[in-house]
Amino acid sequence: MKVLVAPLDWGLGHATRCVPVVREFLRAGAEVELAVVKANANFFREVFPELRQRLAPSYNIVYPKHGYNMALWLLKNSMHLNSVMRYEHHFAEEMVDRHGYDVLFSDNRFAFYSKRAYSIYMTHQRRIAFPRAFAAFERIGVMWHANIMRKFDEVWVPDLEIYPGYAGSLSHSGATPGDKPMRYVGTLSRFSDWDAGENAGNALGSALGYVPAPVDLERDVDLMSVSEFMAHSANVEWNAASEERASGKQTFGMRALGMRAAYKVVAVVSGVEPARTQFEQQLREALQQIPGQHMMILGKPSAEQKTWIEGNIEFHTHLATNDFAEAVKRADFVVSRGGYSTVMDMAELGAKCIFVPTPGQFEQIVLAHDLSKAGYAVEIPADELSAETLAIAFEKSVKMPKVEKQNLLHDAVENVVRRFKERSI
């Protein structure tokens, strides 16, 4: 069974939560390949250096600076979104024709399905939340999303089936795929297989682990014709132990760099521009004023991995999965955006979280508010982030609820494998 996994490129969260999905398909004996863009290619290459990557079209989304513009922005850009979706669907059909995929797995890529492959769509946002001023659009959003779901063979929801789970009303109400199957597959975190006793500080097999060199995808993919895109991308693929490893090039793991025993704050910068850079600047200014040692992870997996220190802040362009987990474990508090993939990761690691939702991403605002209300995390609006508000947050006693061992994802993958075998008979 040949599977192509394609996460949406609105930030890195969709890529990180695909990690356990890829692992489970590999355990089931599937041949897995990855549809990547420039922003997530290096991340996947570090986690799955042995898997072939194929260049996929990018949605090229830039969020507005101010949250109150988001609903109007969505309407304004609906024609662009529809153009990308039409193109994406043609691309998916072409990939099945050229490479013979049996299963297409789409993490929130709205049109990544094919009539000639079993197509799975994953989303935690059955309900697309809008600010109160634009609540009238919410019903339209639900109807639109339901129409998207019905074009796939199966829909997966990365949450617990029993309300409220971790995403609350976002995952437990709203769109349904009609008569198509919909399965809750549990929380999905790239850290679900991380074991502190065996893997802490071991980026890719050793304390001085190899980290693949940056992948150059030449440029972001524009809306070119399908034939042009396929001609451009047909041979853009990478395989595991190739020339980079042979060259002997190494990047040192965090222990070799002298990782500190503890950090007051580990700040994780993520998301799309321009909000990502604004968040980075806010955190720099705030942490410089707060006593103690801090770490900032800049969330730039497409950049060369670098580490440096400025004052009381240790900077990393990005970290391998196990190094990231170790850093979070050593932090008194983690400050990050409140995307759902981050919520699942922090719950898996048992972190004390301060969430600063991305302006305009109302989903993050809803999640952060609900988690704060439940006593699981602290919420700080982006326009209020400062050394003073962080100091107040440090006084609060919060911790993400523990993630219990689940077999929901395993069962979902086994069900797909069983369907494939039945079709093949």
Predicted regions and their residues:
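Active-site-proximal region of nucleotide-activated glycan assembly enzymes
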Residues: 51, 115-185, 190, 209, ...
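C-terminal amphipathic helix plus adjacent low-complexity
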Residues: 207, 221, 226-230, 392-425
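A short, glycine/small-residue-rich beta-strand->loop->alpha-helix junction that serves as a flexible
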Residues: 7-19, 274-277
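Donor-nucleotide binding loops and adjacent catalytic segments primarily
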Residues: 190-242, 247-333
